[in-house]
Amino acid sequence: MAANFQLPLQCLQYLEKRGAESQRFLIASSGGKIYSYAAETGQRLSSWPQDVDASNANNSKATETETGSEDQAPPEKKRKVSPSEEGPAETSKSTVKASTWSSIPCLVAHSNGDYVIALTAEDKCVRVLRLKDDGTLEQLSERCMPKRPCSIALTDDGNTILCGDKFGDVYSLPLLPGNEPYVAPKLPNRPKVPSATPLTVHSKRNLESLEQQLRYSQKNSTEEKNSLNFQHQLLLGHVSLLTDVAFVTVPQDDNFGKKRSYILTGDRDEHIRVSRYPQAHIIEGYCLGHTAFVTKLCIPQYAPGYLISGGGDDYLLVWKWSEGRILQKVPLVKQESETTQVTVRGIWATSIGGSNIVLVALEGSSNLQCFVLGSDGTLKPQDPIEMSGNVLDVAIMEKDSTIVVSVDCIREKGSTHEWRASPTSPSNLIESFRVKPGTENLEWEPVTESLVTNINMGGSSGIPADADTKQRKELNDVLYSLGNLRKKHGEDD
């Protein structure tokens, strides 16, 4: 029997709960689960959703069967309900009866450390979970969006979720839905009437097609279209596929020092849009300079006037975003050694050891590139950090001058599809590094404390090393899909 690989930790978040006693946690998603760990020791505290034992699973199936027979619908159809019919499922239960998702591609930590916002892929749900003092996770709400979300951000006060979907729309949702039930307005469905008539269509085939269109429009004209059954607001829309959302608040340069907030959004068509918040219909400007799709927008907390963006180009751009002005073009690869197309997977900004640091990960690369951001907004490259596998995500523990890096322990270094011959024991799910004190340039040293050891020893979910080609491709696509944003030769811009 072949040994098992361990599913990598796709997303990482560091949380510190504010209170009389500071509590620190590391939250990670792997496959369809979320794990919480003690940040000091790496001890696993809980997983969500909790596993359902066989007896509960059988009872659930029996209940679904009875419900299905009453509604004259097959039981499997009951598992997929439209958001407008189901509404927000708000529950205090931490055990989910049956997971309808296989991956959690996005995790966002609340600034006070009390909440985690998770995006489950297949069911398109934005889920808010409470992180309790003992590290257990409790789901408070689930809100299924009309289109698949691709990016989540929080406003500065932490009370509003900004959710961008792949069709270019950005919605605002309250972090915690109100106690009063939300009544969704029912909007009349506007029938699409074909512009052609029997007088303008002559062939038999076209006449049959016209008759079919007329029947369809008459049928749908009597139906009503339900809106989302939870509190929400559509803020803005792109005509292109949206890729990332960032939120920033900056003081105005006037006598009153009035603060103003903005939403920055990137898309597949190389655009970065700057919109005012909450009046997002007011477009302050664009940051135009990329020649390929944009995947990541990073606004450092220590320098909110600057934007660092990356995507399908082989360089980063540093912006004075309020002016739409490029300050620097930073190469990511050496031109003479470039053999593959570059895609930026993540950009993280932090302040450690008196240095303003920017970290950059490329899709399918085991190098974590490091830069120092100067006061003039320029990036100075430093020596990269070499990992044992491709970099997936980074969590930053500033108080410890430490970063925790999630690495791909299944695929070969530098590859997004080629699996290793056999798994290692234990699997390297994470690696950690600390800034060396007293060095002139930025240098990192590995950390081999209990945090790393215990998380790696604990593992995640097992995947057979002899998984078939179809299963391998599905797992590859979950982690490495950004390259699909690249336009094919001849595709319209």
Curated annotation (Swiss-Prot):
It is found in: Nucleus. GO terms for cellular component: cytosol; nucleus; tRNA methyltransferase complex. SUPFAM superfamilies: WD40 repeat-like. The keyword Repeat applies. Residues 46-96 are annotated as: Disordered. Residues 46-66 have a biased composition (Polar residues). One of its GO terms (biological process) is tRNA (guanine-N7)-methylation. Pathway: tRNA modification; N(7)-methylguanine-tRNA biosynthesis. InterPro entries: Trm82 (IPR028884), WD40/YVTN_repeat-like_dom_sf (IPR015943), WD40_repeat_dom_sf (IPR036322). Its main location: nucleus. Keywords: Nucleus, Repeat, tRNA processing, WD repeat. WD repeats lie at residues 99-139, 237-287, 289-331. Forms a heterodimer with the catalytic subunit trm8. PANTHER family: TRNA (GUANINE-N(7)-)-METHYLTRANSFERASE NON-CATALYTIC SUBUNIT WDR4 (PTHR16288:SF0), WD40 REPEAT PROTEIN 4 (PTHR16288). Required for the formation of N(7)-methylguanine at position 46 (m7G46) in tRNA. In the complex, it is required to stabilize and induce conformational changes of the catalytic subunit. Belongs to the WD repeat TRM82 family. This is tRNA (guanine-N(7)-)-methyltransferase non-catalytic subunit trm82.
